[in-house]
Amino acid sequence: MASTLPSTVVCGSQTSPPSRDCLQRIQADLKDPKLKELAKAVDELPEFWSHLVEVKPVLSQVNDAPLKKLKDWAKDESVLNIPEGLPNILLAPLTVIIHLVQYLRFAHSLDANDSQEDQHHRILQSTSKGGFQGLCTGFLSAAALACSRTRSDIWCNATVALRLATCVGAYVDLDRLTYDNTDVHTCMIIHWEDNCGKDQVTEVLKGYPGVYISVELDNRSITVTAKQSQVSLLRGDLAARGAKLTRIPIYGRYHSRTHAEILQDLLEICSNDESLRFPIISAPIVPLRNNTTGGLITSAEKLHELALKCMLTEPADWYSTMSETVSSLMLQPVINEHPLILELGHVSCLPRSLTASANIRAFTPLLTLTASPNEPDASRYDYPEHSIAVIGAACKFTGAETMQQFWELIRAGGTMVGELPEGRIALDKKSLRKPPREEPLRGNFLSRAGHFDHGLFGLSQREARYMDPQQRIALQVAYHAVESSEYFRSGIKDKNVGCYVGVGGSDYDHNVCSHAPTAFSFTGTARAFVSGRISHHFGWTGPSMTIDTACSSSAVAIHQACKDIRMGECRMALAGGVNIISCPNMQQNLAAARFLSPTGGPCRPFDAFADGYCRGEGCGFVMLKKLSCAVADKDEILGVIVGSAANHCDGNDAITVPKSHSQIDLYRKALSLAAMQPKDITYVEAHGTGTSRGDPVECRSIRQVFGGERPTLHFGSVKANVGHTEAASGIAGLLKVLLMIRNQRIPPQANFTQLNSSIPPLEPDNLSITTNELEWKATFRAACVNNYGAAGNNTAVIVCEPPRLKPSAGNNHILSGYPFLITGQSGRSLKMYCTALGEWLENTDAPLSDIAFSVTRRQNRTLRRRITFAARSLKDMKNILGQQARLDQQSSPSPKPKPVVLVFAGQTGNVVYLHKDAYEGSSLLRSHIDECDKILREMGLRGLIAFLFDQQPIEDVVLLHCLFFSLQYACAAAWLDAGLPVQRVIGHSIGQFTAMCISGVTTLADTLKIVAGRARLIQQKWAKERGCMLAIEVDRQGALELARSVPGHKIEVACFNGARNHVLVGTEVAIQTLEAKTSCKTRRLKTTHGFHSELVDHWLDDYMALAQSITYATPIIPIETCSEGGSWKEFTPEMLPRHSREAVYFFDAISRVDKELGPCTWVEGGVGSKGIALVKCALGTNTSGHSFHRLQLDSSEPLASLTDTTIQMWDEGVDVQFWLYHDTEKITFDSCDVPAYQFDETEFWLLRSDQARQSDLQRGRVISDRYKPLVYLLRDEGFRGEPRKLHFGVNQYHPDFDRYLHGREVLGEVLCPVSVFVELAAKAAAICGGRECSTAATQVQVLNLEIHNPLGHAPGARVGLRLKRIGSCKWGFSVISDKDVQSICHATGVISLRQERHGKLEIGPQWSVIQRVIGYSHIQDVLDDSSAISLKEGIIYKVLEKVAEYKPCHRAIKSMTIKGTAAVAQLEMPAISRDSSEITVSDPLVMDQFALIAEVLALCRDDCKRDDVFICSGLSELVTFKSLQSGLGPWTVYTQQTPCGPRELLSDTFVFDSTSKQLIIGLLGARFVRITASSLNGIVKRANLNSQTSELSVETDAVNHPASVAYPPSNNNDTSDILSILSHLLHEITGLPPSEISASTPLMEASVDSLAATELENRIQEEFHLHRPISLYERQFNVGTLCQEIQTQRDDRLARASRTTTATRNTSFSLGRRTSSTESLPDDAEARFISKSAAVLAQLSRMLSESFNITESILPGTELRSLGLDSLVAVELEYDLQQAFGLKVDLMQLSPELTVGGLARLILASESQTSGHIASSMMDCRQTTEGKSQMYLG
C-alpha cells in the first residue's frame, strides 16, 4: 500500500484568483478552533498595515481596502471578491493562507489518534531528504513550515510569513502605480518543444526592451515578465519559432533587479521590527533550498532577507531547485513505492519533466467543498413534499414597473393615489351616469396603461387597439416574469406550463362595444383570452385558466396553479392577476355600494380614519415549479409556497360581509398543509382594504389564530401603497412578502396613524402594525398572505424563505472577454435595453462575470434583432453599451439558423493535447472527460487525465485512440448540453465511432469498449508491416489509376476526401515507390498504421467478435456514414469490420448532406483535429452560405476560442449556450437583478361615446399614416377609352404638412397657403406621370387655380386630392376634405409638369415675350427711384401682422422697395427652413414668400383702410422655369398690381435669380379680394372647425365624372397600384411597415393569422370592390399572388362592366353622351340624374360609415355583408334609410351580395315613383334607369 506521508512538500507560487468555492472552503477552515491562531494573524493584518504606513508613508498610495476585505472574509460569512486589478497586497498573503490551511488540513487527515504535534512531526520525519520547497511567495510558506518544530512555531512563523507577503505585495503594487500606470507588467509562461528552443526564445526576448526571465520553470519552460502592450507581438514572434505563450494572472514585477532600492527599504523595516523576522535557529529543520540557486540553506539567521531577495530581486531557478530535490529523493534507500510530493497552492508548479522521469507521485489537497453547494440546508424546517418554489416574478403597479421599484415604494411608505389620467375615460354627460352622490374619479392609476409592444407579441396595431388593456399588460408582465425565471435560456423549452390569471371585470368591453364590431372585438374583450393569449404566445400546453372570484381572483389563481403542479397537470405554472380601469361604470357601482372612500383618499388599512377603499390598477405574476424540481434544476428560488387554502363564507349574512370563523378555518387549514404552527408565522400580509366592516373582522381572525404567547407578529397591507388592485390584490401581497424575504426587512405600514376604534389593542396578543422599517429577525421567515373576495371566497397562502443554499462557489474563469448576447424584437427595444443596462451598471458592484451570466441567460433567442460582443472589463462593457453608433452597426436581424452538422475527424497524428485551462475552466467539458476517464478505469485501462495536458507523442495505440475519442465525445456532448441543435453527425474513419455514440447508436461505455478493443487488436495483432498513408491531390479516376500503377505492390485508395483530395494506403515500400514516380503533389500522413487497407485483415475476425458484444440502437440524431452509394440504413455488428476495412467515402457523404440540407453550420467535435478542413476540402468551391466552427482548445487561450466560437454562432442565429453559462456552472455565479426586457410601446386606447369617435379617427389616422408620404395614391378609376381619374390621400400628419400649416398664423389660427395646393397637385401629378413627370428638375405650370374654401386644421377630416388626365402630363385637380356629413372642395385647377430636355425647360411663346418685356431693367428702375418707399424685414412683417404672423424660420423677405403700383423685394430663406423630409416640387414655403410681395403691396395702398385685408382667391397661371429644390436664394422679386373693380386687385409677380438675373418663376393674374378683418376672422375660424356649408359634391370642368364606365385593360401600373394599396392594408392590419413588404412576402411571414386574415379579406373587398371574397386560407398566398388574384377579379368585373356599357350604348342610354334615339334623356334630365345619383351615394356612404364605424372610403361596389351587416345592424340601418330617404326595405330579405351602389339604386328607384326629379321618359323605362345608375354607382 502506498504511503500517504510526503517525501517533499512544495508550496507553489503566487495564487491566481481562487474560485468562490475554494475561498469558501478556506473560509470554513479558518473557523476551525484548531486554526484560530492563523485566523488571528489574518485579523491583525490591517493593524500591521497601519503601522507600516507610519514607518513608510509612501505606502499610503497603495489601496488597503482589499486587506480589510480579507480580514472581514476571514472573520464572518462575507464573500471575498477579487478585484479586477488583482492587487498583490491581497493575493500575496492569500497565497500563504492557502498553503498553510492546506498543509494543516492534510496533517489532520493523517491519523485522528495523533496529536497535532505528532502529525507535524511525522511529516518532518518523512521529508528529511526532500524537505519543504517554495517558489516565489511560496518560499515564505515553505520557510515557515521548515523552521517549525511545534504547532506554536507554525503560528509564530505564519505571522511573519503573512506580514512579509503583505509587504512585498504592497511594494509591487506601489511599483505598478509609479511605473506601470498606463501599461502594467504581466507574467506569462513560454514553452517550447525542441532542445534548441531556449536559444531561439532568448533571441526573441532580446528584441523586447524591459522583458526579462523571472523563473526557470522546467527544462522547456520559463516564466517571463513583460508589459501588456508587448504580449501580442511577443506571442506572434514566439509562435513563428515554435514556442507557445500562456498568460498567467499576475500583474506587477517580481524577481526584478530594479527593486534593489525597495529591497533595502524592506530590510531596513525588518531590522527594526521583530515581527518581520523568522525566529533565529541554527538551520531549517528539514532541507530548504534557495530557489535562486537551488542550493541548500544552511543557516536560518537571515531567512527573511533571503526570502525577500527570492521574491523581489533575484530570478528563480526553480528547475534547478526541484532537480536537486528530486535527486536527493532518488538517493534514499530502495523502497517499493514511488516518492510522494505534497503540492500546496492553487497553482501547480512541479516541473513535469522531473516528475515523469522519476516516477514521482504528486498529491494536492482539495481546495473545494466536498458537499454539493446546491444541497439545501433543511435543518430548521422540513419542507413538505408538495412545496412549490417561486422561481420568477414581475409586476407593474402604480409607481412601480419593476420588482425593485415596488420594493422601494413599499419600504418608503409611499402612496400613489391620484387623479384619473387625462384621456383615459370619456367623461361626457351621456356616458357618466349620476350616482346617488357625486364621487370623485380618483385612484391608483397606471400612467401608461394603454401602451403596448404589439410587435413583440406578433399582433397588429388594429388588433392591439381592440384588446382589453388587461390582456396587453398581462402579456408584458407575464413576459418579464417568464424572463426572470430564465425560461428562455438555451435548450428545449418545457411546454408543459400552465397559466392561471385572476381577472375581475372587463371595463374595456364597454369601450369596444361603443364602436362597430370587428373581427377583433370578441377576442379582445373576452376574459378567457387573458390567460389564453399568454399560453398561446409561449406555446404552452398546460392548463390555461382565467379565474374570477372578485378581489381574491389572483390568490385563487396561485392556489389552483399550485394544486395542478402537485397533481402533475403541468410541470411549471405562471400565476397572478391583473386589474385595469377603463370605464367609469364599475367605479360608480362600487361607490353606490359604499365600498369606496367618499373622499377619494388612499386606502387606510386598520386605521381610525379608514372610510372605504381606493381602487388601484396593476398586474403581477410569479413562475412556479415544484421545489424539488427547482433545486434539481438549479433555479434561483425567491420563496416557497408550502401551503394554500380556499373556502367560502357561510350564507348567514349578506354575501359581501366577511366572516371571522371562515377566515380562522382558512388559516388553520393552510397551516396544516404547511406543517407549521401559528408561532412559525412571523408576518401576515393582510387583505386590509380600509373598510369599516372588513378590517375589524380580519384583525379578529388574525388575533384568534396567530396572537397570544409568542414573539411579536407584525401585519400590514400593501393596499395602502398601491390601492386595492382587486383581482390583482392577492399577487400584490405575495410579491410584497417575497421582497421582504429577499431583503429580510419589514416595511412600514403606509397611511396608518391610529388603530381603528373597532379593533381592540394589539399589544396584549403580541400583534403589531409597524410604521417604521424593521429588520425581519426571525430565524426562519414565513408569512401568511390573505386575500378575500367580495363574493365570499377567501384564500390564504403560506410562503416562506427558500432553502438556505450554500453561497455560490465563485468562478475561476479568467477570461479575456465575457460573451454577451442581447436580443430584442425591434431595434428600438434593443437600444432601450442597452441604455437601461448601462444605467444599471453605474449603480452595481457586481463583477463582470456575474453580469454576463445573468444578462445572457435571460435573453429570448427567438427575437428578431440581436447584438453580440465580448467585454474584457466593466469599463469595456460600459463603453460598448454607450457607443450608440457601434450598436447601430452591430445590431442586426437575427438570421434564420442553418442546419447544424457535427463533424468528427479521423486520426492524423500521435499527439492528443488539451490545454489545462479548458479542462479546469469548463465543468461541462470536464464532466464528460471525467466520465470517459471513469469508464476506462473501470475497464482496467489507464486513466486519461494524466496525459491530456502533455504534448508529447503517445506510442500506446490504446491510450492514443481512447484519448482521441474521449476529447471528440466530450466536446460534442458539451455542445449538445449547451443546446446546440444538431441535425446531422458525420465521422471520418475513427471519428465515426464518436458520431455513432453522439447519435445514440451506441452507448458511451460500449463505444469506449469498441475503441479500446479495436486499438488493442491493432497493437497486438497488426503485422510487422504497419503500412503508411499518403495524401495526394488528384481527381478520383487519377487516384484509382495511381493505386494500380506500382507493379508488385497493392496500393489502395483509403479515403475519398474531396474531388481532388484522396489518401492512398500501402506498405512503406509501395508508397515510397509511388512517391518517387508520381508528379502529383503528395504528403505523408502522421498516422500510426495504414488503415482501411488489406493490412487490417489479420484481426478482422477478432474485431467481428468484439462488435457482436455490444448493443446497437436506432440513431436519435441522423448520422451520415462515409460509405459508398449512401448512408447505412441500419447498424449491425457486420458494419464495424466493413467500416475499418473499406475506404472512407467522406466526399460522397458531405455531398449528400450538402444536397439534402443546403448551406449548413459545420461544427467540429474534438481538439486539434482537421474535421473542418476536410469539410471545406470536400465542398470545394461550393462553400457559399456554409459556415465553419472549430474550437481551439489546444491553444494558449482555449476559453477565448470558446468565447469567439459561441459569439460567431450567436451571430448566425444558432440557439446555443456559452459552455461557461450552462446550468452546471451556475454554482460559480451569483445571479444579478439585471434590467428586464424593454418594451417598444405604442399607445392604444378606444374611448367610448361620441368623444371616442373623434379621438379614434385621429389616433387611428396617426398610426395608419406613420409610414405614408405626404401625397399617396388611393385608387385609379380610369375607364377603357376614357381619361384617367385618380384619387389621392393627403397625409395631414406628415411632418412637412405640419410645417407648411404651422409656419404662420392667420389671425391666431392656421390656414393652408395657396402654395401648398400647388405642391399637393404637383406631387400627385408626379406620382401618376411616371418618369415623364418626375419631381426632379421639372417645370410646373398651374392654370386657373381657384380657391373655393380655405383649408385649416381639420383633425377629424380626411383631406384628399383628385386628378383627371386631360393631356400629356396635364391634369385637372381638386383638393377636397370630408368630415361628418360634409364634403368640401377647397381648390381646383389644372396642372402640368415638364422635365428638362437637354438641360433646358420648355417655355411657351408667351413667356418668351414676357421675359423680353419684363427684364431686370424694370427692377433697377424701381430701386433707383428716389421717390420710392423702402421697407426693411421688421417693418414688412409688422405690416403683415394685420393678417398673419410668420415664424422667424419662415421669413425670407429681407427688404422691399415700393413705387406706385410696383414693388421690388430681396428674399433669402433661412437655412433652418430646409427641413423637409421629402423632395418638394414647388417648395411651398418659398413660393408663399414670393406671393407675399403682392399682399404687402396691397396692404400698403393708399386706399387700404384700417380694417381692410386682402386674401388671394386664385390665379390665372403659375410657371416655374427652374427647380427650387434645396435653394435658399437670394432672389429678386418684381410685382405689378392692377385694380379690377373696387374690391379686387390683379397681381403679376416675377421672380429672378439675384446672381444670374434669370427669370425663374412667374405668377400671372393672382386675384386679391378686399374684405374686412372681422370677415376674415370668421372665415378662418370656420376653416379650422370645418363648419362651412357647401354642396355635397363640388366638381369643376377639369375633374368632371367620366362620361362612360368603360374600363382600361389591366397593366403593370395597375398591379403596382394594387401592391401599394395592399401594402398599406397589411401595415394597418398587421403593423408590418410597408417598406418590408414586397411581392415575394408570404402572408404567414407578414403575421396574417386567422383573425387578421378575416379582417384583410374584408378590407380587400372594400378597397377593390370585388364581387366575391378571396379566401386567404384556401391557398398559401404571398403578396404577389394575392395582387394577381385581385387583378384577375378586377379584370373579370371590368369586362362585365364593359359588356354592360356596350349593351347600354346599343339601346342609346349612354350616360354623358347624346344620341339620336328618341328614348334618350334630355340634357337637363341627364344632368339632374347624375347630380342626384352623386348626392344619394355620398349621403349613403356617410350613413354607412357611421353605422359600421368605418373611417376609410366606401366604394359603390362594396357589399353590405362585407361591412359587417347582420340582423341587429340591419334594424338600425333600415330605420336610418327610412328617415333619410323614405325607403322602407327589409335588408335581410335581399340578396346577400347587395352592394352600396345597388342600395343607392333602390333609393333612386323609390324616389322616382314619388318625385319629379327624373324625366318621365326615364320613369317609363325602369331598365334604362337601372342601367344608368349601374354605370354611375358601380
UniProtKB/Swiss-Prot annotation:
Keywords: Multifunctional enzyme, Phosphopantetheine, Phosphoprotein, Transferase. It is an enzyme of class 2 (transferase). Residues 1269-1398 are annotated as: N-terminal hotdog fold. Pathway: Secondary metabolite biosynthesis; terpenoid biosynthesis. SUPFAM superfamilies: ACP-like, FabD/lysophospholipase-like, Thiolase-like. Signal peptide: none annotated. The modification O-(pantetheine 4'-phosphoryl)serine is found at S1650, S1767. It comes from the Eukaryota. Its EC number is 2.3.1.-. Residues 1616-1690, 1731-1807 form the Carrier domain. InterPro entries: Ac_transferase_dom_sf, ACP-like_sf, Acyl_transferase_dom, Acyl_Trfase/lysoPLipase, Ketoacyl_synth_AS, Ketoacyl_synth_C, Ketoacyl_synth_N, PKS_Beta-ketoAc_synthase_dom. Residues 1269-1577 form the PKS/mFAS DH domain. Residues 919-1164 form the Malonyl-CoA:ACP transacylase (MAT) domain. Residues 1269-1577 are annotated as: Product template (PT) domain. The active site is at C551 (for beta-ketoacyl synthase activity), H687 (for beta-ketoacyl synthase activity), H724 (for beta-ketoacyl synthase activity). Its cofactor is pantetheine 4'-phosphate. Non-reducing polyketide synthase; part of the gene cluster that mediates the biosynthesis of meroterpenoids called sartorypyrones. The biosynthesis of sartorypyrones begins with the production of triacetic acid lactone (TAL) by the NR-PKS spyA using one molecule of acetyl-CoA and two molecules of malonyl-CoA. As spyA lacks a thioesterase (TE) domain, TAL is likely generated through self-release from spyA by spontaneous lactonization. PANTHER family: FATTY ACID SYNTHASE, NON-REDUCING POLYKETIDE SYNTHASE AUSA-RELATED. Multidomain protein; including a starter unit:ACP transacylase (SAT) that selects the starter unit; a ketosynthase (KS) that catalyzes repeated decarboxylative condensation to elongate the polyketide backbone; a malonyl-CoA:ACP transacylase (MAT) that selects and transfers the extender unit malonyl-CoA; a product template (PT) domain that controls the immediate cyclization regioselectivity of the reactive polyketide backbone; and 2 acyl-carrier protein (ACP) domains that serve as the tether of the growing and completed polyketide via its phosphopantetheinyl arm. This is Non-reducing polyketide synthase spyA. It comes from Aspergillus fumigatus (strain ATCC MYA-4609 / CBS 101355 / FGSC A1100 / Af293) (Neosartorya fumigata).
